[in-house]
Amino acid sequence: MISVNLTTMHSRLDLCAATVWSIINQSVQPDKINLWISNEPYLSDHGIYEIPAWVEELNKINNIVNVHYVKNTGPYRKIINAIINSEIDDILVYADDDVIYGRQWLEFLLGQFYENNCNVAIAARIRIMERNIFNKYKSYSSYSISMKKDKFEKDFIITGVGGCVLSKRMIKPSIIGDDAYLIISPKTDDIWISKMLEASNTKVESSPDALRCVHEILHGYNTLSSINTLTSKNNGLIIKAIRMVKNKFYSYFGL
């Protein structure tokens, strides 16, 4: 089964409707679109108490949108719950809730996934972590975005805005159940998910074709992962988060 997974908050429901509409109109259709939401508040999310009316309207076009109420873990709801509730070979795609995805976005991601025999995670947008002459990581804003089909085993950060394809078997079971991210990295889900894959020895490949189908919606609403798009004044926070997440996984595996 192929599912596309998203999460959102009350202040962004209208944006999410546009995103889901773009996914329903893909050239290759998923079997399900899962919207993972919560009614209790967490961080900047005040909770969603009623299923938005647009879910029923969009299901009239294609009845594949499913709403799941889960514990509010912020941005992690969209993929952690999908992984936990999936079968071993289900194909899981996660996406952001403030993006219009061009018609071939999913087609390109899945095509590359199949080209790699479903053994490599595929992400539209990957930042390449680079070091300076002192062998220290440069600031997040200086990490270049991969613009060709490159495979990565380490020193990469998947940015969720572009979408990513993976499966449950790509992540070690012992890592899936670890919710330390709620303390170590509550907002930087992109970093945590990237390190989950790296610690599981799963390669990730960038998809420039899918990246060209990603159209971010400009808005002033609260972001679910604000640190991922911070200005240069917050680069220190991002590097600190990367270091904390990496140390967590290194210590876990005795490295």
Model segments located where?
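Short internal beta-strands
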Residues: 34-38, 123
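A conserved hydrophobic helix/loop-capping motif in glycosyltransferases and polysaccharide synthases
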Residues: 3-11, 26
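Short beta-strand-to-loop acidic/aromatic patch adjacent to the donor-nucleotide binding site
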Residues: 89-98
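C-terminal catalytic/acceptor-binding lobe
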Residues: 1, 15-19, 180-255
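Short, acidic, metal-binding catalytic loop of nucleotide-sugar glycosyltransferases
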Residues: 19-31, 39-43
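Residues at the starts of beta-strands that form the adenosine-phosphate
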Residues: 1, 31-32, 91, 203
